[in-house]
Amino acid sequence: MIDYYAPIIPYVGMAGILLYSKEEEVNKIVSLDNAEKKILNDKWIRYDIDNAVELFFHKINGKLFRITTLEDYKGKLFEKIKVGMTVEDLIEYDSSFYYDEFEEVYESDKGIFIETDPQTNTVKWISVYIKELDDKNFDDGQWWYKFFRNGILNRTRKIGNHPWTTPIC
């Protein structure tokens, strides 16, 4: 079950779901069978779940590489930033965000990008993603193997009041 109030944690996850998880692992938390599945291109699959989150999986390795909030998600980034807040409040709270004209999103080097509604000037979506998303070789799908080699999988993390288990390869 999705935790609509879980914190949004850059490079880690949100909604009680961890980045780098496999589809089968996420399916144990939330039924992907009931989610709207979209094949975005020959390498990406997206699941839209309960108007709360979008999950982006890489087709080559089956790993979750991006999670995006939708309208019904209530969790916060850095205990303050949330869907529906104004862009002015976003920038006031964290001045590291800058607007990327090409992508049309606010970005931060902290592993987040935020899409806004230009008519209301409010935060529409918040995305967290894996560090490798910006790598030139991201599409080859080999990025997750370094975590397996480095032995950092299969550990339990407690983040706030949310104990999340790092996914198994």
Q: How would you label these PLM feature ranges?
A:
Residues 1-169:
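Short helix/turn-capping signatures at newly exposed starts of structured segments
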